[in-house]
């Protein structure tokens, strides 16, 4: 897949004839010399433009809706090499795929601004394209100035800390002398008054130690020279627990000796971001055992014709979703949800360096043979990093199958923006009792579904799984 450029544009566009993706470039503002001439002053307002020097910037294109930066995998052309319109110039790695970037212009690759293995944000200049050989040196100077300015920005020293002059000493206020406000009212507890009367103690002469000078029973007993009772002595309040500052960072264990740190690839960064985002969605999980004897028999019949087990499972899931559309719904803003008009089954595929989910669009409507053919094409594109954006970001329901690795059960993490994801385990011989109490051995696989509890409830998911199990256990409808 290739990407090419068009003057004075900044957004990506598709070129259907070559199945390429185009990105924009513009004439460098600092090198423009524009003269507008009116062609027909009386009747027309059209203007023509002449440009003295055309040095165009090659921008980092947005290859997907979630892409914020791209990585230069390799430059196909070298500096100074002549380019023809439509030729691929550079390979860019997005968060999902590798794509060729091509140009709409004849000229020369004057300068490479972003080297191989480096990343750049979407819209940033990654190279310069000159119209003639005479402009190559000028473009290289421009590229050098760009590089030096970016380095200068990176090493700008932080301003020295501002030292404040010592604050002037604040005069301490003079001690305040207590002023008598005349005879005060004696405040004592009822029991203290009773004790004072019993022991003939002048209550007015007792100094209170209670709240706000209140005279307590122990104060009276002290004044009377009597040992206070144990019950009258209030135990000292326990010391408050020490206030500790809340940790703002997680204390990670130190790196083991001889360990190495490997930075995320663009794809791994995208997966990490999606997994963290999924933590904000309230989910629940439901498991369901499914008898696969009939499905296994059907698979043996259609396998020689190119039908895959993935296609069988995707077809069964699509047919079940058609009967339970709420499981195929999406909640993206936390305030509403939408019933998707298509059933697009995304299937997880492990590829070198990450994970991607090619999408089988309209899985409920395609027949098994076309679905299998489409799936093989998608897997080939995924492993060569040639998937187009709509082939991996349009899923409404996800299927993850680890049964091929012998895994009998597992839970899958719900992708953001989808209502549910199905985790399919391996089919294994299991002893099962029928309704009459007779035991037999049947092949059974465990299916676990993780769903968004904001839109899908337990009864919805249970009904969906029952329908899915009936289709698998009676798979004749899959071949229709």
From Swiss-Prot:
Keywords: Acyltransferase, Chloroplast, Glycolysis, Lipoyl, Plastid, Transferase, Transit peptide. Residues 1-53 form a transit peptide. Residues 187-224 form the Peripheral subunit-binding (PSBD) domain. Binds 1 lipoyl cofactor covalently. Residues 55-133 form the Lipoyl-binding domain. GO terms for molecular function: dihydrolipoyllysine-residue acetyltransferase activity. It is found in: Plastid, Chloroplast stroma. The keyword RNA-binding does not apply. Its EC number is 2.3.1.12. The modification N6-lipoyllysine is found at residue 96. It comes from the Eukaryota. SUPFAM superfamilies: CoA-dependent acyltransferases, Peripheral subunit-binding domain of 2-oxo acid dehydrogenase complex, Single hybrid motif. Residues 234-243 have a biased composition (Pro residues). The active site is at 453. Residues 142-156 have a biased composition (Low complexity). Its cofactor is (R)-lipoate. Disruption phenotype: Embryonic lethality when homozygous. GO terms for cellular component: chloroplast; chloroplast envelope; chloroplast stroma; chloroplast thylakoid; cytosol; cytosolic ribosome; pyruvate dehydrogenase complex. It is an enzyme of class 2 (transferase). GO terms for biological process: glycolytic process; pyruvate decarboxylation to acetyl-CoA. It catalyses: N(6)-[(R)-dihydrolipoyl]-L-lysyl-[protein] + acetyl-CoA = N(6)-[(R)-S(8)-acetyldihydrolipoyl]-L-lysyl-[protein] + CoA. InterPro entries: 2-oxoA_DH_lipoyl-BS, 2-oxoacid_DH_actylTfrase, Biotin_lipoyl, CAT-like_dom_sf, E2/Pdx1, E3-bd_dom_sf, PSBD, Single_hybrid_motif. Belongs to the 2-oxoacid dehydrogenase family. The pyruvate dehydrogenase complex catalyzes the overall conversion of pyruvate to acetyl-CoA and CO(2). It contains multiple copies of three enzymatic components: pyruvate dehydrogenase (E1), dihydrolipoamide acetyltransferase (E2) and lipoamide dehydrogenase (E3). This is Dihydrolipoyllysine-residue acetyltransferase component 4 of pyruvate dehydrogenase complex, chloroplastic.
């Amino acid at each position: 897949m290739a990407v090419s450029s068009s003057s004075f544009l900044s957004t990506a566009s598709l070129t259907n004839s070559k199945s390429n993706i185009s990105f924009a470039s513009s004439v460098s503002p600092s090198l423009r010399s524009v003269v507008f001439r009116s062609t027909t002053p009386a009747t027309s307002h059209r203007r023509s433009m002449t440009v003295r020097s055309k040095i165009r910037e090659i921008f980092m294109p947005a290859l997907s809706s979630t892409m914020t930066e791209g990585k230069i995998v390799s430059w196909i052309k070298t500096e100074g090499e002549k380019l023809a319109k439509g030729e691929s110039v550079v390979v860019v790695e997005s968060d999902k795929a590798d794509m060729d970037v091509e140009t709409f212009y004849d000229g020369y690759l004057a300068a490479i601004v972003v080297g191989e293995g480096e990343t750049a944000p979407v819209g940033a200049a990654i190279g310069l394209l000159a119209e003639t050989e005479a402009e190559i040196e000028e473009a290289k100077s421009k590229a050098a100035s760009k590089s030096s300015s970016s380095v200068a920005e990176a090493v700008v020293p932080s301003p020295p800390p501002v030292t404040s002059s010592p604050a002037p000493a604040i005069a301490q206020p003079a001690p305040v002398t207590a002023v008598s406000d005349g005879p005060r009212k004696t405040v004592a507890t009822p029991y203290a008054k009773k004790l004072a009367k019993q022991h003939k103690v002048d209550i007015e002469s007792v100094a209170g130690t209670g709240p706000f000078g209140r005279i307590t029973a122990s104060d009276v007993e002290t004044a009377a020279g009597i040992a206070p009772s144990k019950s009258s002595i209030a135990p000292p309040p326990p010391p408050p627990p020490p206030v500790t500052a809340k940790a703002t960072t997680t204390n990670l264990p130190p790196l083991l000796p001889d360990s190495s740190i490997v930075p995320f690839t663009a794809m791994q960064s995208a997966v990490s971001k999606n997994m963290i985002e999924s933590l904000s969605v309230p989910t629940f999980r439901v498991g369901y055992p499914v008898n696969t004897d009939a499905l296994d028999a059907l698979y043996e019949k259609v396998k020689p014709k190119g039908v895959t087990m993935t296609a069988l499972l995707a077809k069964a899931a699509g047919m079940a979703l058609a009967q339970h559309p709420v499981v195929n719904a999406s909640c993206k803003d936390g305030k509403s949800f939408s019933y998707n008009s298509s059933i697009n089954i995304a299937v997880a595929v492990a590829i070198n360096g990450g994970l991607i989910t090619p999408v089988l669009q309209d899985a409920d409507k395609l027949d098994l043979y076309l679905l299998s053919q489409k799936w093989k094409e998608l897997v080939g594109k995924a492993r060569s990093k040639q998937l187009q954006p709509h082939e991996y970001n349009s899923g409404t329901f996800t299927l993850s199958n680890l049964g091929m690795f012998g895994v009998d059960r597992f839970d899958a993490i719900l992708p953001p923006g989808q209502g549910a994801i199905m985790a399919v385990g391996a089919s294994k011989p299991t002893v099962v009792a029928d309704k009459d109490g007779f035991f037999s051995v049947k092949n059974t696989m465990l299916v676990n579904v993780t769903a968004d509890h904001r839109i899908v409830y337990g009864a919805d998911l249970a009904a969906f799984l029952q329908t899915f199990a009936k289709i698998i256990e009676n798979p004749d409808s899959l071949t229709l």
